[in-house]
Amino acid sequence: MLSGKVSLRHRRWRLRLLNHHLPLAFTALLAVVLLYRVLPRLDAIWKLSMATAYVGLFLLVLTLVIGPLRILQRRRMPLSLDLRRDTGIWAGILGLFHTAVGLNVHLRGRPWLYFIYQKRESHFFPLRHDQFGLANETGLFAAGLLALLLATSNDWSLRYFGTPGWKRLQRWSYGLFALTVAHGILYQVIEKRTTTFVATFLVLALMAITLQAVGFFLRRHNDRSKASHQWMDQGPAI
């Protein structure tokens, strides 16, 4: 019995590896390389930061829209969907890599200055509260949430926390998305990004927001319809 369960888990993992992880890894790496090659500036660290940021954002958006798209197709929505989970894993890997690279773009070798003012700058409160500081602080909080979600995107965590606890934990992905959008908007302004970058960012963000909203209202409508049908089937209480 136990060996059968282990064998089933191994088979499921092999299928996820072949059908999800390898294609996602190859596609993400290819996209990063292509974007790196076409970016105009010569600075390698900036180009790598931008390439991983936009590919990571695309994967995060894809993770968030898989559920609503299944609802629109009237397909059953399981508690944990392997494709969504595996896409989220690669979004997390790229996002954390972007964080590590991004901390070396503007202030080489002095990453703490992304979050606190230099000593020679006179500020009563040492934490940066200008646009640059807020952009980096939202990015840091997003990276923290990303690490948490990445660490718990597995079957062991689902069993450990139980269904309600794991679902509550995974809902922090919406907070992650909000922080990512805030971080992105601030950097569009700080770096005075070109129209192409701004348009790409807005399209991806609005796609996720729109489909999430549609999925939310459809789910509520379906839940109300089910409750109504159950009440009609049971009949009025006497």
What are these model-predicted stretches?
Residues L2-I238:
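Membrane-embedded alpha-helical bundles that constitute the cytochrome b-like, heme-associated redox core
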